[in-house]
Amino acid sequence: MTAVAPRRAHPFAPLVLDDTGSLEAMAEAVMRLHSTLMKVGRCYTTDATGDRAALELGRVESVLAGAFCTIFGQSPADRFADIFDQVTYMAEHMVKDHIFEDGNKRTSLVFALSVLRFASTPVVLSDSPEPKDNQYYVWIQDLVSGNRSRADLAEELRRNYVVYHDCASPV
């Protein structure tokens, strides 16, 4: 007689946010992140107000729903191989939809890395001051330009996942 072991959850399973509160909180976090990046990044635009701000928030919510919510009965766990695939999808749609007047690449990259860290799957890439040697810069540029496939970009995140065993980790 053969015993069947229960299937364990994938250690890097996609996040599922099917409640409205979580999705709204995540969208607000993106908006706050974008605002902060614009202030510290010496950008030429300021935060959107009025109708433009509402439009941006709605577009962010749409991208996040596509990445993190069940759609037509299909869970993110059914659509994405793992969380790395999921955040690459999210970053691709956020940056290519050009939601904000400025800072789309920065916001998309930093938020994707933040989601990975929140999910205890932090990624560390080379952060060289030279853009051509900076893996973060190359990753987002390749995402925007289509130089590499989304699967290749997700694989790079997967390869650079780091495990920290103490609570005082730098990530």
Model regions: which residues?
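FIC/Doc superfamily catalytic core
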Residues: 1-171
